[in-house]
Amino acid sequence: MSSQAFRTGFVAIVGRPNVGKSTLTNALIGSKISIVSRKAQTTRHRIHGVLTREHEQFVFVDTPGFQTRHGGAMNRMMNRVVTQALADVDVVVHVVEAGKWSEGDAKLLPLLPKAERTILAISKIDALKSRDELFPFVAKIMAQHAYGAVVPVSATKNHQLDQLLEEIAQRLPEGEPMFEEDTLTDRSMRFIAAELVREKIFRLVGDELPYGCTVVIEQWEETDAHARIAACVVVERDSHRPILLGAGGQHMKRIATEARQDIAKLLDKPVHLEVYIKVRKGWSDREGALRDLGYE
């Protein structure tokens, strides 16, 4: 029996929008618990993903991108989620896209904890034309904030993810595991299903449809043999409905089909998925409406 102490703790994955936080979280855990698209603001909730190894349990908190535009209830809510996560965790991984430092990255620096608890992860390094660009880019960031470690990674190529996990593990406190060994997330299947529908919407019509769109699971009936799910897509304007439907309803059919396939894979059983649309004007700019729709 190993005498090595078990370590467990919460790890926040933070950064400005669209730097690859959810892709990195999914790659570290080895399962899709956070939705991914090329659009900013895809992640709106804190999502806990769990990875258990022989001597460690990592509880990852995938946060929304930190917003530098102010004034909207949705942006205020997402920034509260980020700042709360930073206060509640044991280790912070600050994700910065390789070669693309911006004001949004800099705005997070004053919120980061002490250097020994913070790791700089340079994401998407496979997109760099030359690795010679990496050192001056990292030096520029380190001149503005001290980090306990710097790890260049590529989540899509599985590059240096083990090294990042080792750096995180060194900083976790000793303690008993918080979740069963086979747990992947503390989010419900209903929540993950709604997120998967929202992912398909962002991927298919994200360029045309503004961010006033969310998904609520209104029916969930599950047996050992199959599941029947009804998902309501809530939009802010009547003009959003035809964008979602597409010509002859083709967009909605594709969204439902692709989401159903992912949910069936997750549940490991056949799924009947019904997706329909409701208009709720101005919901994304009213904090009461955000709470009603399940936002923190």
Curated annotation (Swiss-Prot):
**Mind telling me which Pfam families this protein's record contains?**
KH_2, MMR_HSR1
Q: Where is this region: G4?
A: 123-126
Which portions of the sequence form the region G1? 15-22
Organism superkingdom: Bacteria
Q: Single GO cellular component annotation?
A: cytosol
UniProt: GTP binding residues:
15-22, 62-66, 123-126
KW Nucleotide-binding (keyword) present:
yes
Q: Which GO terms describe its molecular function?
A: GTP binding; GTPase activity; ribosomal small subunit binding; small ribosomal subunit rRNA binding
The annotated region (G5) lies at: 153-155
Keyword Cell membrane belongs to the record: yes
Q: Which GO terms describe its biological process?
A: ribosomal small subunit assembly
Tell me which residues make up the Era-type G domain: 7-174
Give the matching NCBIfam families.
Answer: era, PRK00089.1, small_GTP
Q: What does this protein do?
A: An essential GTPase that binds both GDP and GTP, with rapid nucleotide exchange. Plays a role in 16S rRNA processing and 30S ribosomal subunit biogenesis and possibly also in cell cycle regulation and energy metabolism.
Complex formation = Monomer.
- Name of the protein in its database record: GTPase Era
Q: Which organism is it from?
A: Bordetella avium (strain 197N)
Gene label: era
